[in-house]
């Protein structure tokens, strides 16, 4: 059963290119570690909610946009093994030092796929 890691993060609008560059460099590493697919999406139609919304969820500031992304794996076991490899790979550590967003406000989690058509 496919397993998906989902992420939502606020990125300063003027760092869109830097984010895209970082994501493009990271994608092959995720695939090397077992990911099937990596998708990164920049907000274009994200309405403000009355109780909650994407912007509130990541405490996006006025100058920030929301990025919604996910990584697909063939199984949770492959994902767990990939996470272990990533944590010890020096190439991944470089990303942690130069991320163009505040990682403390990122929300993320792992999800079992229940419908995939």
Swiss-Prot record:
Q: Which InterPro entries match?
A: Dimeric_a/b-barrel (IPR011008), DUF1428 (IPR009874)
Q: Which organism is it from?
A: Shigella flexneri
Membrane-spanning regions, if any? none
Q: Which Pfam families match?
A: DUF1428
Report the gene name.
ybaA
Q: What's the protein called, per UniProt?
A: Uncharacterized protein YbaA
């Amino acid at each position: 059963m496919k397993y998906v890691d989902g992420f939502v993060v606020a990125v300063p609008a003027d760092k869109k290119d830097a984010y895209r560059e970082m994501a493009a460099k990271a994608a092959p590493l995720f695939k090397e570690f077992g990911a099937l697919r990596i998708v990164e999406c920049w907000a274009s139609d994200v309405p403000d909610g009355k109780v909650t919304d994407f912007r509130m969820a990541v405490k996006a500031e006025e100058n920030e946009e929301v990025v919604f992304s996910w990584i697909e794996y063939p199984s949770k076991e492959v994902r767990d093994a990939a996470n272990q490899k990533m944590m010890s790979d020096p190439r991944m550590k470089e990303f942690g030092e130069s991320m163009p967003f505040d990682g403390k406000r990122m929300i993320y989690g792992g999800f079992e796929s229940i419908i995939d058509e």
